[in-house]
Amino acid sequence: MSELNYQKQAQDYYGKAPVIILGSGASAAHGMSGMSALATYLVNNTDISGLSAGETETWVKFCQLLKDKVDLESALHQVTASEELTSRIVMATWTMINSEDNDVFLKSLQDNTIFPLSLLLEHMFKSNLKIINIVTTNYDRLAEYACDQGRIHHYTGFTHGFFRQLALPTEITSVRRANIWKVHGSLDWFQSPLEDTVAISNIKSIPDNYQSQIVTPGTQKYH
């Protein structure tokens, strides 16, 4: 019986272009908050000023569910939030995660070994692969930062630059590329006043008349 050639086996796997899937654990490893911390933040920081009586009642019910130890996603499923209340929840969610995301980015400027994903991608691209697909449910941009540290071009559905517009993959050409598919949206995705979807990089607050396009847990993600 011949001895298994692990190097050849690994090369065969790489040749099949495996998909990398990133869940919340990938972000938690860098100190990003999970659902429990987000739930606490929402209760304490969501702006509920000016809501209607019905919206306020829904908010109180939502907060009580969280205090009763119902998890965030289940709590959001058990209430019917209006478009306005949902917008407030999205804004608070964006504010918290964007701040933590920025902290990780600043740390990465001082430590070029902070992202294990960079090493994985660099290793995978030592094969004949030209494109690697990454699928993530996370709003943060840690996958993008990891690509940058590894000198790997990445595509998230938009053109390059600071103010980015929707683009097909064929519009972005490079010798090798990581496609990052963000199924719940991203911190830098917004609906503009023209009602088109754009991406704006590394901002500390949501611009006036722009709406974050992250999809919070609960019924919103089915819309």
Annotated model-derived regions:
Residues 1-223:
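Conserved catalytic-core helix/loop/strand module for nucleotide-ribose chemistry
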